[in-house]
Design a protein with these regions (language model features):
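Bacterial N-terminal signal peptides that target proteins for export
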Residues: 1-8
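C-terminal motif of bacterial Sec signal peptides marking the signal peptidase cleavage site
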Residues: 16-19
């Protein structure tokens, strides 16, 4: 298994996804607006509620309302966790599989995790070489969180929570029940980025810093070129070589190439 500095680890998706850039040549989060007022009750009641959530997560107006209403958003996340076991599994019904994918989307779209995924995919599509890692990192971190530690922390927490759902999904045997308006290509690219962020946290916790919160703080310092960060020189294993079994299942379900 290869090893590299933590700084380089933040751009591993550029190498992982470069081989499937044509496959990922779309914006996973771009959709027409379908305004709706989000209420927890709208999303309860089994398949119908999940279909409503899938539709609403495709609406920038509804997503903006969810961002502005953390009480409803947290209640919805909790509902998906307790009703469908999206972070723990087993995801042994089509509704549970769909709910896990929607849970990941909910967390990413109500933080800046969606923009991070899109920026990484854009870098894959436009970069001809990796070159200056600091420049690459600056280009993929969303502008609204790059200098805002509260926003950066929310984005990271969202990615870590989404990773739990993607790992639970990939622990099941494909094919999967994909929500309306979503593709397994969407899921694969988001799952890869979410897993990467969990891998970075795992690599520096507790060996460098004691808690996940501390790890996120150090990552914030790193992306802002703060010389007080403790992780820029840390050597860590490439989390995508080999690809872990849940991600392998997700990539296989998407028909996406990946390291063997």
């Amino acid at each position: 298994m290869s090893r590299m500095k933590a700084t380089a680890l933040l751009v591993i998706p550029l190498f992982l996804l470069a081989g499937c850039s044509a496959f990922f040549g779309f914006n996973a989060f771009k959709s027409l607006d379908e305004p709706s007022a989000p209420k927890l009750s709208d999303y309860q009641g089994g398949s119908g509620g999940l279909a409503k959530l899938a539709s609403d997560l495709g609406s920038p107006a509804v997503v903006a309302q969810l961002k502005a209403d953390p009480t409803t958003t947290r209640a919805l996340e909790s509902y998906l966790e307790t009703t469908y076991q999206v972070t723990t599994g087993p995801l042994d019904t089509p509704d549970k599989e769909s709910a896990a994918m929607l849970y990941g989307d909910l967390y990413l779209k109500t933080t800046s995790g969606d923009e991070l995924v899109n920026n990484i995919v854009a870098a894959v599509m436009t970069s001809t070489q990796t070159g200056n890692i600091s420049s690459l990192i600056s280009s993929i971190i969303p502008a609204d969180v790059a200098g805002n530690e509260t926003g950066f922390t929310a984005m990271m927490v969202g990615l870590l929570q989404a990773n739990k759902a993607y790992q639970a999904l990939g622990s099941e045997t494909p094919p999967y029940s994909v929500p309306p308006g979503m593709t397994m290509g969407d899921v694969a690219q988001k799952a890869a980025v979410a897993y990467l962020m969990q891998a970075v946290v795992n690599a520096i916790t507790p060996s460098v810093v004691p808690t996940t919160a501390d790890a996120i703080h150090e990552m914030y310092l790193l992306v802002n070129n703060d010389p007080t960060n403790q992780i820029s020189g840390v050597s860590v294993a490439d989390p995508f070589n080999p690809l872990n079994p849940p991600l392998t299942n997700i990539f296989d379900a998407a028909g996406a190439p990946h390291p063997k």
